Amino acid sequence: MTSYNPASPDFPFTLGIEEEYQVVDPQTRELRSYITQILDRGKMILREQIKPELHQSMVEVGTHPCRTIQEARAEVVRLRSIIAGLARQHGLTIISAGTHPISSWMSQEITPFERYKGVVEEMQQLALQLLIFGMHVHVGMPDDEVAIELMNVARYFLPHILALSTSSPFWMGRNTGFKSYRSALFANFPRTGIPPSFHSAAEFHNYVNLLIRTNCIDDAKKIYWDLRPHPYFGTLEFRVCDAATRVDECIALAALMQALTVKLHLMFSENTTFRVYRRAVIMENKWRAQRWGLDGKLIDFGKRAEVDARALMYELVAFVDEVLDELGSRQEVEYLLKIAEGGSSADRQLAVFRETNDLNAVVDNLIVETLEGVPAYQA
């Protein structure tokens, strides 16, 4: 029988968080293509926990697998502290948000690795302009069949999670009108967005093998869905979120994804069903989430009615309530209600801009919020 207690040696639902940070010059407020210099020292300290991304102005970090959300918080704080400290040694800093408010993709340098050269060769301008930053959460799975079963039903909640995480309202100096413009940009890539449902793990693997055999992809990691079974880690990977600005937001979202996975697995173990909805209808909600975030309405497909997004966040927290105490994540998940009431990072960015009419002030505030509660790194 599957254990839902993180202290149990049989607990499968471990947690891992990957964050993509912006490398920023605090004087000009612009992105800086400087990751190679940061990596030189970062690899010595963090080893496999730090890696470059397509653009030289981005750095990706990942926690070790964690059993509890408290372990994950400690890891995220440590990683933000180290990367900010390494950046500071070069007169730079970091931001965690889905897009940079003012910098242009045309000014960015591409990381000179063969992998990224291949991406640019295939995707051309789509790759060059993909100057976006996300947060990925891995939840451990007992096996492939469970991963597919849970992916099928968890897809329904992806727009809700996105609405809470929105942090990309600005793009190249313009107010886009979106709460998550990152999502709109990423939709230009193939194999993105809400995944289809699969009847079994075998059907999923057959699909992946077909793509590889027909030269669509050379690696299953080039399936970029908002939720996917990770091809190597044995996890279900939630990829829908904009990069979370505050540590508290990052941890609340990760705690929700772990709790949601456990809740859905518990329902399966009790022979309680959760309807598998068509991709097309979930995409309607994703559009609303990326456009209006928490200020909009999402469709409750069970009720066949629109519901205020903020009200649905209360329902979502109530839905996972019964597993929170065993997971030890009640405080972290209930922080989502503060986000629902007070707004996401996108809402705060827009508020700063309304008050100041100055995108530099938005950048300055993002720098402050990214490092709230993060101690200065001591080399």
From Swiss-Prot:
GO terms for molecular function: ATP binding; glutamate-cysteine ligase activity. Gene3D superfamilies: 3.30.590.20. It is an enzyme of class 6 (ligase). SUPFAM superfamilies: Glutamine synthetase/guanido kinase. It comes from the Bacteria. The keyword Chloroplast does not apply. Its EC number is 6.3.2.2. This is Putative glutamate--cysteine ligase 2.
